[in-house]
Amino acid sequence: MSGHSKWSTIKHKKGAADAKRGKIFTKLIKEITVAARMGGGDIDSNPRLRGAVAAAKAQNMPKDNLERAIKKGTGDLEGVDYEEILYEGYGPGGVAILVECLTDNKNRTIADVRYIFSKAGGNIGTDGCVAWMFDKKGLITISKEESDEDTLMEVGLEAGAEDVTDEGDCFEIITDPADFDAVKGAVEAAGIKIEMAEVTMIPQTQTRLEGKEAEQMVRFMDALDDCDDIQKFYSNADIPDEVYDAM
């Protein structure tokens, strides 16, 4: 299970730059709007909206922006009607890729996504071609400065977590999506600061990439991250730390 949060952490560091912040806000606003449209504007009764708002607050999104996004979703303000699309395919070295999109123009999005895959030497596949390789899980990341593994095991497992793992520079708590909020709440109630918390797709197995393929994969993920219509992407690539550090 090693490396679940590696790319999320890298994206988080990159996202701290001012040049990236506007793009991050755009994607968060889309997610908040769609979450409010589908489940209503009350974060207490809408888990998806609650997660989106938490992510927005973690990025210091202004309160006015956040509230406007919710109102656009509930129809209190006029907004764009986004469609959710999932693309599946293969990247460098044949790694499996899932790409989640929110778009107001499906033709534009498929053209952009297809181009990104093609440029990386990959291709978009048929529905279901790689989704079976991933499990939907809650993922909570905690710095080793915040807690120790025994404490997290006690707090997490008692609240319904499936596993607690040592990932070198941090601990990861894995949950069933249905237990995510309860486990997250228990960790916070114990006074432990959470570094990152999200419901994500975790690969059942990973494909190791080395050398040029690994470098190509990092550039591919960068391109996916830069596409406005792509909200999230997941892969089963296992990339050496030194490749990340060198790029």
From Swiss-Prot:
Cellular localization per UniProt: Cytoplasm
Pfam families: TACO1_YebC_N (PF20772), Transcrip_reg (PF01709)
GO molecular function term, any single one: DNA binding
Species of origin: Desulforapulum autotrophicum (strain ATCC 43914 / DSM 3382 / VKM B-1955 / HRM2) (Desulfobacterium autotrophicum)
Transmembrane segments: none
Keywords attached to this entry: Cytoplasm, DNA-binding, Transcription, Transcription regulation
Protein name: Probable transcriptional regulatory protein HRM2_04000
UniProt record, GO biological process: regulation of DNA-templated transcription
GO cellular component, one term: cytosol
HAMAP family: Transcrip_reg_TACO1 (MF_00693)
Similarity comment text for this entry: Belongs to the TACO1 family.
